[in-house]
Amino acid sequence: MNTQDVANDLVTLCKQGKFAEAGEKYWADDVVSVEAGAPGGGDPVSRGKDAARGKGEWWEANHEVHGVEVEGPYVNGDQFVVRFKMDMTPKQSGQRVTMDETGLYTLKNGKIAEERFFYGG
């Protein structure tokens, strides 16, 4: 699969709410996942598929998602960008918010070698 194919499929899965399935399908074993902030007070950088999976499990356990909009993908070479807008409630605060996030994905051998997330205000 080329970058466009991977990007299109990842977006399709995310639009269906299948974020964990998208990760399992496309993360490289040594994927590096970088958040703008440290999730749950942990490290903002997760290294390896198990760590990325754990970060996702923590996120799902600590947030209630009411709806998701997914835009993209926007492809350039071995990279692509996807924008996510999530209507969600962090369980700790109980305050419903809209999170605006952009993911930059870099592929190597058809797998996500790095994902880097940026947040809007």
Q: Across the structure, where does each feature detected by a protein language model lie?
A:
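Hydrophobic side-chain positions on well-ordered alpha-helices
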Residues: L13-C14, P73
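Alpha-helix initiation/capping motif
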Residues: T12, G41-V45, G94
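Solvent-exposed, amphipathic alpha-helical segments
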Residues: V6-L13
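A beta-strand edge to alpha-helix "cap/lid" segment located at domain peripheries
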Residues: N2, R53, E57-G121
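A solvent-exposed, acidic/Ser-Thr-rich amphipathic alpha-helical stretch
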Residues: D5, A20, E24-G77
